[in-house]
């Protein structure tokens, strides 16, 4: 429900680029997935972005849910949304794409990869996509989801008109509950999980079995 509000937080922070060096320019892009029955207030988003002096671009796309029944709707939507973002970025000469993922997103992805993929990895704060000559950055990677929710409430950001019907049916929503359970066991669990990503003790891990 707060995806749009994350975008607005990024735009608000981007406004501060006027006092930073090196100089850079930003544009806001909203990808509309026409085959998923959710609804955003596009006029509100456009007015908010342009009120900060940020150009707003709306790009529609869709995908066929039947193309790969092994993949969840959330995975297919995310993959096609990302592809559309690359298309728009290339068309407008952008070299970086700033995504609104926060710390909770990154830790939930880590837990999903461990649980379902048997891999220790997640979404990095910075990812150079050499194939596309593009860099993905996640400027809110250290921000808690609860802090963004508080900011959205204080600033009076509007929520989506209609949320995605698949929102509560994904592995991510399950991992969100797992993270909450871990924090009940240890209030500092999120920081331990984060620290584990840069504290790999290879000598204490089993060798790969072919």
Report residues per predicted region.
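A structural signal for isolated positions on well-ordered beta-strands in alpha/beta enzyme cores
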Residues: 25-29, 57, 135
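Single conserved hydrophobic/aromatic residue that forms the stacking wall/gate
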Residues: 1-6, 10
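Short histidine/acidic/glycine/proline-rich micro-motifs that form metal-
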Residues: 30-37, 165-169
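Active-site adenylate/phosphate-handling loop in enzymes that bind or generate adenylated species
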Residues: 75-147, 193
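Short, surface-exposed alpha-helical segments at coil->helix boundaries
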Residues: 11, 39-46, 145, 149
């Amino acid at each position: 429900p707060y995806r749009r509000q994350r975008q607005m937080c990024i735009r608000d922070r981007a406004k501060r680029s006027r006092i930073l060096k090196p100089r850079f320019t930003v544009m806001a892009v909203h990808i509309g997935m026409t085959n998923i029955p959710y609804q955003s207030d596009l006029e509100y988003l456009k007015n908010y972005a342009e009120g900060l002096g940020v150009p707003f671009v709306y790009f529609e796309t869709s995908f066929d849910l039947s193309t790969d029944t092994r993949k969840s709707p959330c995975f297919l939507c995310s993959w096609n949304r990302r592809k559309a973002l690359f298309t728009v970025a290339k068309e407008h000469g952008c070299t970086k794409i700033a995504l609104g993922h926060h710390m909770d997103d990154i830790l939930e992805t880590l837990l999903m990869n461990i649980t379902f993929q048997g891999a220790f990895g997640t979404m990095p704060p910075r990812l150079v996509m050499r194939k596309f000559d593009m860099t993905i950055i996640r400027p809110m990677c250290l921000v808690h989801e609860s802090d963004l929710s508080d900011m959205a409430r204080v600033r009076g950001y509007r929520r989506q008109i209609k949320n995605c019907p698949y929102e509560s049916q994904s592995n991510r929503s399950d991992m969100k509950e797992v993270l909450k359970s871990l924090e009940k066991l240890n209030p500092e669990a999120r920081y331990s999980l984060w620290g584990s990503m840069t504290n790999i003790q290879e000598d204490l891990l089993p060798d790969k079995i072919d």
